[in-house]
A protein has these predicted regions:
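N-terminal regions that are enriched for targeting/export leaders
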Residues: 1-11, 27
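Conserved, well-ordered alpha-helix/loop/beta-strand core segments that scaffold catalytic motifs
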Residues: 183-184, 188-216
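Catalytic domains of carbohydrate-active enzymes, especially glycoside hydrolases
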Residues: 24-49, 284-285
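Outer-envelope exported proteins of Gram-negative bacteria
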Residues: 44, 207-209, 213, 287, ...
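Surface-exposed amphipathic alpha-helices with a cationic face
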Residues: 34, 194-204, 327, 351-352
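C-terminal accessory segments of extracellular proteins
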Residues: 478-493
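Alpha-amylase-like alpha-glycosidases and glucanotransferases acting on alpha-linked glucans and related
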Residues: 9, 15, 53-187, 191, ...
Length: 493
């Protein structure tokens, strides 16, 4: 079935409280998607962010981001008084999230709400703690110790805490019991709102596509609580880390720095870590986009401590074996494979064997440096998801500002672009008209925004990354009607 959707991070929704949340603006966006003839709302990972504000580098691959908790909803539930958050300065720029300011001001408000919630929702909290015990107790303990240790990475904690000495952890649990309760309660508040939002989306015929990074952050509860699943030495320091090799776009490659999986141990344990992770994510989302899918076929391993990715080497991943086990235990999986980047025949075979749809990015189709491009629409298989660009790319208008004249001419000719229609509409039209079963556009492109609205520039640390926000009133009925007509025209409703 031909469908379409919009990529819009929750943090990018309009809000008077500094960042997009799961409140009324999110429900308004769901209604907009429904009116616009869309079937999917794709979001970025909803995990807590850490240094650099990237949702792909999180303290936990299970937890929800406290910043996304809607304060008005907490107030309506009787957990906050309006004057406890309305008069706080959440930042002066409605088009940008200020993470530093949020870090300093949001938690004080959440502490007040959590205190009331502990009394008001005792039964529900007990149930939530029981249901999520597998990850929640480690995460809450991790965050409580982290605060006690002034926020430093767990790799710098005292050895007895790093190596999870049972006696030492028992002492911490007793000493930090109120803090642990707070971090657990914040997750309860997050997932209470999340379930409500997802149910609302589903009732309106909208499915949510979640995004899960293949790797987890080294400074995370995941690695601290499960060190045997990763390539760590006896001192729990990474042996090798993840990244991408040098190519025509980057002489040094990309050094991501995430610890690599110990696939040997994972296989011996029947991939339970992965089965648990995917099972959990499929409860939260309707579909999953798995980032860096090629890493399951072969992964790039860079010696820990290197400053660039030049000295890395390819090593064999688990391949189809992992997906066979997951499928056997969980059934058919609604997964989109992010298969961008350096692809080999064996990656293509793995994708084919799983049956997952891969991704096509239109912005990659017209690059004269890449003559092997499979990104031109006349080469697409039906079983794929086409994007004009993703969160890691320029917006369409930003892209036209950065590409060579030759590439721009090729793109204009191929897609029959005109200034009268607007290059962004012409490019999106090309994607919607393609044979790809699913077409997802960034909200920034639907709004015709330029390079200032780019979500992320990979391998850079900047307050421009992850901070774009949408102004109130921009997703309206007029825009929804235009999109609805396009969907009808190209058979996507």
């Amino acid at each position: 079935l031909r469908k379409a959707g919009i990529l819009m991070p929750i943090t990018s929704l309009p809000s008077p409280y500094g960042i997009g949340t799961m409140g009324e603006a999110a429900r308004e966006f769901v209604r907009f998607l429904h009116k616009a003839g869309q079937s999917y709302w794709q979001i970025l990972p909803i995990c807590p962010t850490s240094y650099g504000d990237s949702p792909y580098q999180s303290f936990s691959s299970y937890a929800g981001n406290p910043y996304m908790i809607d304060l008005d909803e907490l107030s309506e539930a009787g957990l906050l008084e309006k004057d406890e958050y309305k008069n706080i300065d959440w930042g002066s720029n409605p088009e940008k999230a200020d993470y530093g300011l949020l870090y300093n001001r949001r938690f004080g408000v959440l502490r007040k709400a959590a205190k009331t919630a502990e009394e008001k929702y005792q039964t529900e909290l007990t149930e939530f703690r029981k249901e999520n015990h597998k990850w929640l107790s480690d995460y809450a303990l991790f965050m409580a110790i982290k605060d006690e240790q002034n926020g430093v990475s767990w790799l710098e904690w005292p050895e007895i805490l790093r190596k999870r000495d049972n006696k030492a952890l028992a002492v911490e649990r007793e000493k930090l019991k109120d803090e642990i309760k707070f971090w657990e309660c914040v997750q309860f508040l997050f997932f209470t709102q999340w379930k409500k939002l997802k149910a609302y989306a589903n009732e309106n015929g909208i499915k949510i596509i979640g995004d899960i990074p293949i790797y987890v952050s080294s400074d995370s509860a995941d690695v601290w609580a499960n060190p045997e699943q990763f390539q760590l030495d006896d001192n729990l320091m990474p042996i090798s880390v993840a990244g991408c090799p040098p190519d025509g776009f980057s002489a040094d490659g990309q050094l991501w720095g995430n610890p690599l999986f110990n696939w040997k141990v994972m296989k011996e344990q029947d991939y339970n870590w992965w089965v648990d992770r995917i099972a959990y994510q499929t409860q939260i989302y309707d579909m999953l986009r798995i980032d860096h899918f090629r890493g399951f076929d072969a992964y790039y391993s860079i010696p820990y401590g290197d400053k660039t990715a030049r000295n890395g080497e390819w090593k064999e991943g688990p391949g189809i074996d992992l997906f066979n086990v997951i499928k056997e235990k969980l059934g058919e999986l609604p997964i989109i494979a992010e298969d961008l980047g350096f692809l080999t025949d064996s990656v293509r075979k793995l994708l084919k064997d799983t049956g997952f749809p891969g991704m096509k990015v239109l912005e990659f189709a017209f690059d004269s440096r890449d003559t092997e491009s499979g990104y031109l629409p006349h080469l697409y298989p039906k079983n794929c998801v086409v994007y004009a660009g993703t969160h890691d790319n320029e917006t369409i208008l930003g892209w036209f500002d950065t590409i060579s004249e030759e590439d721009a001419e090729y793109a204009k000719k191929y897609m029959r672009l005109s200034e009268a229609e607007g290059y962004h509409w012409g490019m999106m039209r090309t994607a919607w008209a393609s044979v790809a079963d699913t077409a997802i556009m960034q909200m920034q492109d639907i709004l015709g925004l330029g390079k200032n609205a780019r979500m992320n520039t990979p391998s850079t640390l900047s307050d421009k990354n992850w901070s774009w926000r949408c102004l109130p009133g921009v997703y309206n009925d007029t825009l929804a009607d235009v999109l609805h007509q396009e969907m009808k025209l190209y058979g996507r409703i």
